[in-house]
């Protein structure tokens, strides 16, 4: 029998998230996380889904090689070791593929070199992704390793959406353009939303709102992305937990010239001290809503700014698409924060967008419609599953996949 298991790895700068899936039925066999790698006391949480009983280890994990060795040992205890003949491939999340990678790719030396060449446009993410890949390749050099790129789904954008209005020669020389991120999530949710509507992806136009601590919007026409809110980096677009999103670029020059801030200080400000946390000191939407309900004016203003930006993108992408069949909310805030969904859609009745308050209040892990039955445009809540998407794309490349259609 052909191997049917795929290990999905998401390697961050000081963490490794992983899931082991059986692609015969897309079931999860184990999930886990190693965090605080290289920080003295590291923590591993491993859950075999056969028992559902988690194991936690706290011990020094010096680097990603040691982390993956620990993961392999924990999987082996459950009979799910990396040396199993049932393991078909390892799928890696890679944040930035630039224009070079438009689809999942089996990793070889040339692919590694190109991911490394893209580090200047993804200095926080690609180095960690590369470390995870190289470590996994050393553990199982005989096994296919597949890179699934966050940017790939957005490579279908027309040049009119992807190009910035700056000097073409300068832009090309320094690879300055809109790449977009969260593409794995947008791809999964766009197909899942079409399924929820009972239609083929090629027949629907969607606005997908991935609202987590990081947040992005995309306009999807017939299954292909035609615009997205994040740009050269994940800083552009919506107001996020700690990122500013859109603003006048001259703010940067002002802060450097008048405020005396360095490049690194401005970078840190806009990426980690802005957005909701900069506006009200909190980046947890649950806490912000609690404060709003208690009459906190600063939290209320932060919420209003967040919603204002979100509405602007919904309206803009409605104009880009011309016809919209559904607006889909996903990720931590999008899936769980009913007040965010209600506020974002409020006042858009002329566009055919309405939220049913009772449906919107229901909490569920299942995809669902929260607009009235007779609404012209569906408003949907569709839980994302980036790990399953990576596993499906990986398995499609190395075996026979069972796609979400």
From Swiss-Prot:
Pathway: Metabolic intermediate biosynthesis; acetyl-CoA biosynthesis; acetyl-CoA from acetate: step 1/2. ATP binds at residues 17, 210-214, 284-286, 332-336. The record marks 182, 243 as: Transition state stabilizer. Substrate binds at residue 93. Pfam families: Acetate_kinase. Homodimer. NCBIfam families: ackA. This is Acetate kinase. The lineage of its organism: Bacteria, Bacillati, Actinomycetota, Actinomycetes, Kitasatosporales.
